[in-house]
Swiss-Prot record:
Family according to the record: Belongs to the HopAB family.
Gene: hopAB2
Consequence recorded when altering residue 464 to R: No effect in ubiquitination
Site, E2-binding: residue positions: 479, 525, 533
Chain intervals for the UniProt region annotation (Required for E3 ubiquitin-protein ligase and anti-PCD activities and pathogenesis): 512-529
Keywords linked to the UniProt accession: Hypersensitive response elicitation, Secreted, Transferase, Ubl conjugation, Ubl conjugation pathway, Virulence
EC primary class: transferase
Reported induction: Transcriptionally induced by HrpL.
Disulphide bridges, residue numbers: none
Name the UniProt record assigns to this protein: Effector protein HopAB2
Reported effect, residue 327 to A: Reduces interaction with Pto
Region ranges (E3 ubiquitin-protein ligase): 309-553
Subunit (UniProt): Interacts physically with plant cell Pto.
Intervals of motif Interaction with Pto-kinase: 325-328
Amino acid sequence: MAGINRAGPSGAYFVGHTDPEPVSGQAHGSGSGASSSNSPQVQPRPSNTPPSNAPAPPPTGRERLSRSTALSRQTREWLEQGMPTAEDASVRRRPQVTADAATPRAEARRTPEATADASAPRRGAVAHANSIVQQLVSEGADISHTRNMLRNAMNGDAVAFSRVEQNIFRQHFPNMPMHGISRDSELAIELRGALRRAVHQQAASAPVRSPTPTPASPAASSSGSSQRSLFGRFARLMAPNQGRSSNTAASQTPVDRSPPRVNQRPIRVDRAAMRNRGNDEADAALRGLVQQGVNLEHLRTALERHVMQRLPIPLDIGSALQNVGINPSIDLGESLVQHPLLNLNVALNRMLGLRPSAERAPRPAVPVAPATASRRPDGTRATRLRVMPEREDYENNVAYGVRLLNLNPGVGVRQAVAAFVTDRAERPAVVANIRAALDPIASQFSQLRTISKADAESEELGFKDAADHHTDDVTHCLFGGELSLSNPDQQVIGLAGNPTDTSQPYSQEGNKDLAFMDMKKLAQFLAGKPEHPMTRETLNAENIAKYAFRIVP
């Protein structure tokens, strides 16, 4: 037999060559014991090696394997390249001292005081985030939904918080209604991690559901023997998902990470909604109100009273608003910019403004007596306003006069007071009281920082003058009505969400978005309660210059 290994008495291995084929000269010179193409060629002994009669050291694993029976080409290549020698193996077995053992760890060099100072803020944020999660769980919020909405808020996408989530988030993120939630906020980052852990804990503690039986298929219904056959293997290749476990299938269920934005309200102030409140939802709500038989003039009066004087909306109109999906009240802590009643109010003013004045339904008004009976004791005739609703029992002269000014644009204070104050001697005091409530705000108009009309009409701000654009595209006042710099009865301003020093010009980063409005209507709104209509912070004549910007031609 060719290539049989034999061992002598001393335990040294030698090769017996029985191949009858002649060997090459190189093989004769080197004393190689095999020249077959099927066996590896043993390298010749170096010149400085001891003679062959000296006792040879025990062969290594490579030599023993090379002297074995005929090997394949892959085995020879692995033998020549991959198998380690004895020297390599001994080197690999030496213990090596790592650099980490030679040098102390960085954590060991830190002092306890420095570590405590560096980790204290993060521990505070973690504890705060955990308390928010506990509050959400105790209020029954959907933690998975909260986690998704928080992710959208940090990314600047649209969100749809529930009432519970919105109330809790406003407690811990007070600037959320105006500026959203920053992705760099440490509390937001820790809260996102706490919500992720809470979702995983809920998933782990949930009861295991039995997998839904899948419909029978040729691959799934075949017997065990056929599964092990060639046909069974082919069937599994054609339908690979049939053989997966239920856990694998459940883990690969697609998750919609971009929820649809239908009926979702942006957490940041939407400039498009601020420029034009008559959007599709408001128009659809108006159509629904008309189908219910609601008088649009009565609706406009109720909305103006609720927005400007914070008077409750009548029950019948409130019920109709609820039927079209609009909350008939504005919470004290809610921004007016984001409330659908403002959208409805703007759309309603646009719709009624398109109608001829002769076709408008009359507003509820005080019964008008004959002209002969309207003379005052001093011989003067009463001044009748175009819109003069009935006076409420709880309204004093100042409150009723401010409401008349709001309902009758262009009418002066004296004319409005003369319309409902019968005693001529009492009129000057009422006029002074109304001006005292309005003038401190309106008198600041000329002192405000300016924004040119060209800058206001840029794509960033998007102001559109009613004198230059179509009615459907013009900018409306936050409290209703089209805005135009050519209207002498209006003081067009842009009210910012953030205050800045009066020496600084407007900047998107510092002041955030602008809400365009008539400063006269803003003064009437602040006469009832001096608070910012968007942030609910204190807004009066002393600090309005830090928020407002005058739009100039």
